Amino acid sequence: MLAMPRLITLSLCLFAPACLATCPNWDDARARQEIHQLQAQLAQWDDAYHRRGQSLVDDEIYDQSRAQLDGWRRCFVGTGAAPDPLQDAGGPLRHPVRQTGLVKLADEQAVATWIARRRDLWIQPKIDGVAVTLVYRHGALQQAISRGDGLTGHDWTANARRLAAIPARLAVPDEVILQGELYWRLDRHVQASHGSAGARGRVAGAMASNGLDRNTAARIGLFVWDWPNGPDSMNARLGQLAALGFPDTQAFSQPVETLEHARHWREHWYRQALPFATDGVVLRQEQRPPAERWQAEPHWAAAWKYPLRKALTEVRDVEFRIGRTGRITPLLQLAPVQLDDRRVRMLSLGSLDRWQALDVRPGDRVAVALAGHSIPQLDSVVWRHTERAPVAAPDPRRYHPDSCWRPAPGCEQQFLARLVWLGGRQGLALEGVGAGSWQALLEAGLLPDLLAWLELDAAALEQVPGIGKARANKLAASFARARQRPLAQWLKALGLPAKQLPPAADWDALAARDLAQWQAEAGVGPARAKQLQAFFRAAELPALRERLRAVGVPGT
């Protein structure tokens, strides 16, 4: 099977999110161990990609992992060089003109500086596909060469002849050398919404196959991004390419003069429907040096990548949040990473079961993505640190809807969550009372139970650190108004899992209901009926009822 070239990110590690962190505090032995592990992971991905045309990891995450390895090697110079990711990507055929990489511009300031120093510029979408060199002689396609290591590649001519996007003949007798991107055709693909959709891997797999079938061949297009021995004028190159049967280049090339022009087209191609996946834009200067002088990263072209859809980052800590009902939610504290316009420092794993299945621990590297409504979520665990840091998780048997009615040791989180619910909009809607207020009262030792605040007056509140006279008066007034709330509102504030209760609800009548009576209520099924019945049987509830009765809450 033919080896496949992986398009390695050649940008300086300075611009990669994975490299922005300081050097790890490792001794040499630990550094060698961690670097060796990451090298082995990258080697596995490279082997699958280059030899089998399989992409085992998202391209963004691969690029960031490679940048992370480069950063570690700079931190620990005595550990030896990492293998060249392209060492096995070369092939027996030499490119007639070197396949170059691209300098990556980190931000708008870098783009503005690059533009200001050049003239006669053009912008094109940066197609997320597989690079190829085409050689025509006497009008006939002679060779199609994989990118390989940029200098040599493999013979793709047989499969290239099966692609309708590559003409078998050109109406030009002279030698024509074209460099471009084979891409997977997509229907109205919006990069901002759909991401790369695995497009690059599909093309890589297809071109690695020994026999390309007709249906697959029809899905592969070609975007010619350079004609090394073509006309000097960009307009002439674009027009002649279209006439020769390569229309995409002209359709998706625009002249630019300013950062504003470049920003417009970058945003347009990011959010508008296109027939291919992209991962940024390419800025090109019309004038180029002779092809024999092209370098690995030319000064006359640069890439401005799109915001990351997936980012590689380090897990700094694993915390556990215990909610009002005893639900345990694992939270990952992350090394800050930018995703689109969000700075992500923390994300939720949703459930204790999921954390246990993933076994995420401090030091692990994870891929983070934005889900609906720009909510960060864990995409995958990319690799794990060799030394597994211990994590003490709460015992789920200890926490449930009937636990932590008082701030006993280990109950601080659930008890505070009960207070926040009680005072919030879904409960008593206590004006000016939030988590900070409850925390201050807890730290002052004034809340031995869930309703002890009913007995606090302004004088007592004023003694709490951080609560002055004016705020104490407001809190006392808010607490006093709570006594006038109806019983139904109080029961919901205490955690009764019912959407609606009769306005003139009576405690004794509700507590005496059996399962059938609860299920007679609209929207109450067997499970909810059991929860409602269990609520009134909670051991702490009689004492709370007495507090309500003492302050005159009707229906108690």
UniProtKB/Swiss-Prot annotation:
GO annotation (BP), single: DNA repair
Uppermost EC category: ligase
A Pfam family that the UniProt record links to this protein: DNA_ligase_aden
EC number(s) reported in the record: 6.5.1.2
Active site: K126 (n6-amp-lysine intermediate)
Record field: catalytic activity: NAD(+) + (deoxyribonucleotide)n-3'-hydroxyl + 5'-phospho-(deoxyribonucleotide)m = (deoxyribonucleotide)n+m + AMP + beta-nicotinamide D-nucleotide
Top-level taxonomic group: Bacteria
Alphabetical keyword list: DNA damage, DNA repair, DNA replication, Ligase, NAD
InterPro entries: DNA_ligase, DNA_ligase_B, DNA_ligase_CS, DNAligase_adenylation, DNAligase_N, NA-bd_OB-fold, NAD_dep_DNA_ligaseB, NAD_DNA_ligase_OB
Entry's transmembrane regions: none
SMART domains referenced in this protein's UniProt entry, alphabetically: LIGANc
GO molecular function: DNA ligase (NAD+) activity
UniProt family annotation: Belongs to the NAD-dependent DNA ligase family. LigB subfamily.
NCBIfam families, alphabetized: PRK08097.1
Function field: Catalyzes the formation of phosphodiester linkages between 5'-phosphoryl and 3'-hydroxyl groups in double-stranded DNA using NAD as a coenzyme and as the energy source for the reaction.
Protein known as: DNA ligase B
Annotated source species: Stutzerimonas stutzeri (strain A1501) (Pseudomonas stutzeri)
Lineage, highest ranks first: Bacteria, Pseudomonadati, Pseudomonadota, Gammaproteobacteria, Pseudomonadales
